[in-house]
Design a protein with these regions (language model features):
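Surface-exposed flexible segments
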Residues: 31, 37-39, 219-225
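Basic side chains
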Residues: 18-19, 23, 205
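Functionally constrained cores in energy, signaling, and assembly domains
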Residues: 16, 27, 38, 50, ...
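Structured, non-membrane catalytic/scaffold regions adjacent to prosthetic-group chemistry
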Residues: 44-280
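N-terminal secretory signal peptides
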Residues: 1-20, 34-35, 41-43
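Sec-dependent signal peptide hydrophobic core
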Residues: 25-33
Length: 280
């Protein structure tokens, strides 16, 4: 996994000027053992100025609240996240339904990981969460299961973007089983040691550091184990542009733009782009 320098971490007043971000990086460094899953890049970073906490919470892709980057921050303020339950079902021996309180009772840790958007921008975020495998191990996955599907809540009354057919709602994403069980595939419940903001996917989302950001579903209500590859939202909308796997790869361009470089959010619009690293 890629190690970030302290100066590269997206700060909130330097994270209250007293937190050490690097303790979270040790998790998983010796645990990346699944040969079929790419390793997050470990080369030295060339990030410049860090982005701000304000940017993390005001510059978002979350089409359920609108297609503009500022729409989620403006429109998600009154989004209801309590009560909230999440179901784990499908090809499992022990289907499970957990309240958000039960999910939050699972021990979390800080994980400093870079989000790389398919649009060609990035930011480094200190997430709070735990490995998805901790949930999946509770349900005893059946041998036939090959994929894990994530489903976002459908609530057009509050998620105004769902009133329009921008995507096929509810939002669906998915992973192979081995990807889902990777220790760095994270159930995110917060950032900067705080509760996850609504515009960032509250009350819980998935984050997969070696994949483009759209693979990380937000406001999840169902996790389903399947034999067939899930019909994911963006693949369904434009299969030639947004593939199922969508690993960060500077050598494979999007049909409409290069993926060789990225813009660091928070830097000047005139700042040079940085090279994108394989698997982020």
């Amino acid at each position: 996994m890629k190690k970030f320098k302290y100066s590269e971490i997206t700060p909130e007043k330097i994270y209250h000027k007293r937190r050490s971000f690097m303790r979270s990086i040790s998790y998983g460094l010796g645990a990346l053992t699944l040969s079929s899953v790419p390793l997050v890049n470990t080369k030295a970073s060339n990030l410049n100025e860090p982005t701000s906490y304000d940017n993390i919470t005001t510059y978002n892709n979350y089409y359920e609240f609108g297609t503009g980057k500022g729409d989620p921050h403006k429109r998600a303020k009154n989004f209801t996240t309590r009560p909230w339950n999440i179901k784990i079902e499908g090809l499992v021996e022990k289907p499970l339904e957990l309240s958000i309180e039960e999910v939050l009772s699972i021990k979390s840790e800080e994980r400093i990981l870079k989000l790389r958007c398919v649009e060609g921008w990035s930011m480094v975020i200190p997430w709070l969460g735990f490995s998805l495998s901790e949930l999946l191990n509770k349900v005893q996955i059946k041998p036939k299961a090959k994929f894990v599907e994530f489903e976002t809540v459908y609530n057009p009354e509050e998620m105004v973007g769902q009133r329009y057919p921008v995507l096929n709602w509810p939002y669906i994403e998915g992973l192979r089983i081995d990807e889902a069980m990777h220790p760095l595939t994270t159930v995110v419940t917060g950032l900067y040691g705080k509760t996850l903001p609504n515009q960032n996917g509250a009350p819980l989302r998935i984050f997969i550091p070696w994949k483009y950001g759209f693979k990380s579903a937000k406001a999840i209500v169902k996790i389903r184990l399947t034999e067939k590859m899930p019909n994911t939202a963006w693949k369904n909308a434009s299969p030639k542009e947004y593939g199922f796997y969508s690993n960060v790869n500077p050598e494979v361009d999007h049909p409409r733009w290069s993926q060789a470089t990225e813009r660091v959010i928070g830097e000047s619009i005139l700042a040079p782009r940085i090279k994108t690293l394989m698997f982020n």
